[in-house]
Amino acid sequence: MKINKLVLLAFLLLAFTKNQAQEKKLLTLKEAVEIAVTNSDDAALAKTKVETSKLELDNTKNNRYPSVKASGQYLRLSSAHVDSNIQSNNDSGSGSSSGSSAPLKIDQLMIGQVNVAMPIFNGFKLKNSIKESESLYKAETFSEKHSKEQIGLEVVDLFSSLFKAQQMTMLIEDNLKTADQRVKDFTAMEENGLIARNDLLKAQLQQSNVQLSLDNAKKNTAIANYKLITLLKLPQDTEVEIDIEAVKRDMASNQGNTSLGERNDLKALELKKAASESAIKIARGNYYPSLSLTGGYIAFDLNNVLTVTNAMNVGVGVSYDLSNIFKNGKQVKLAQSKAKETEIAVSLMNDQIKEEVFQAQQNYNLSLKQSLVYGKAVEQATENYRIVKDKYDNSLSDTNDLLEADYQQLQAKINQALSKADVAQKYYELQFASGKLTSSLNITQN
């Protein structure tokens, strides 16, 4: 008996711990977007691309500095024979001849050198390469900002889906309570012969349909919640609760903001166009020769024969690829063609953005009108159900009328709840199309 009590206590403790593990987190839309643009993988990828582009720019700038190369060699020689016209000091005396001198032992060679080259002129290719890299780096920074706008829009969509699913779950649960009570009442009435069994079956059928709708709504809630916490990198057992009142306040506070937004993806593309124009200049630079200032130092030692130190040199180097006279024309045309592609892409994006803004504005206007209509529909459906219920209680209407009025009332409430989410969603879609989504939430992009 004591063991059974311990098992029961352990089971209750485990159940309590599991319930405690279900962490509920109240989130505003602003908080969710801030978390997403900081923690999501897409944000990390966009940031890494910016860092990579910055490193590419720094590497290009490094080409402005002189290149310094140092090298050294130590060679071991065996049986080396050296012919030299350099007369040794030992042979400079007059009349002293003691026969042929002993052969020199030459068994090693050491060479050390340092070379410096400083580019002076290369057809302005270096200057334009830096401009190209700077434009691409700036373009990547605007692409990162646009990525954050896209992440924000994804959060808005998930917020809307989760809110809709939660509202449907709540409304259907309330309706299921009514359906359960109706089945109990109809069962008692059928047993007392007050209604036909067919009416009870209709009520039970509606009860089953409501239960199926509730199960589907709970499934949609779980999926939307999972997608949101995955995007936000929250613990997997987190249950997000949406602060809809904060969403309304944020929307209301931003209604007076009439500042013009700019699409960061358009800015990025315009900067890529500038980079393509620099690429044309780089290609044209191949028509010019390259000029550089060179200098060096060399030390040389051939054992027992020759030692050279402090041998410094300074000069100018010129190089020119004659084949560029014939080949480079294609490179220039290729660069010009790519620049033309980018120019057309900018024009297309301008038109696309105008269409997106217009469509988003129309969708937002429609959502506002629909919200008003759905609000009136709830009042009408509620009053209709009250009237039909009174008639049914007084045997002036049948079960079909009652169940239909109940369904219409539920559908009207669901439509009203969904329309609230639609208004917010369409509003922030308009902000995204205008390039103002994060700024409308007072989120500063670095």
Regions found by a protein language model. Give the residues of each.
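Bacterial Sec-dependent N-terminal signal peptides
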Residues: 1-29, 446
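Acidic, low-complexity, intrinsically disordered peripheral segments
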Residues: 20-22, 78, 236, 415-446
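Bacterial Sec-pathway N-terminal export signals of envelope proteins
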Residues: 21-69, 73, 79, 232-277, ...
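Periplasmic alpha-helical coiled-coil/stalk elements that build and connect Gram-negative outer-membrane
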Residues: 27, 55, 150-260, 367, ...
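Small/polar (Gly/Ser/Thr/Ala-rich) solvent-exposed segments
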Residues: 44, 67-85, 101-107, 117-146, ...
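Amphipathic alpha-helical coiled-coil segments
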Residues: 45-60, 147, 151-170, 188, ...
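Extracytoplasmic loops and strand-loop junctions of Gram-negative outer membrane beta-barrel proteins
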Residues: 94-100, 262, 299-300
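Transmembrane beta-barrel architecture of outer-membrane proteins
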Residues: 109-111, 157, 202, 290, ...
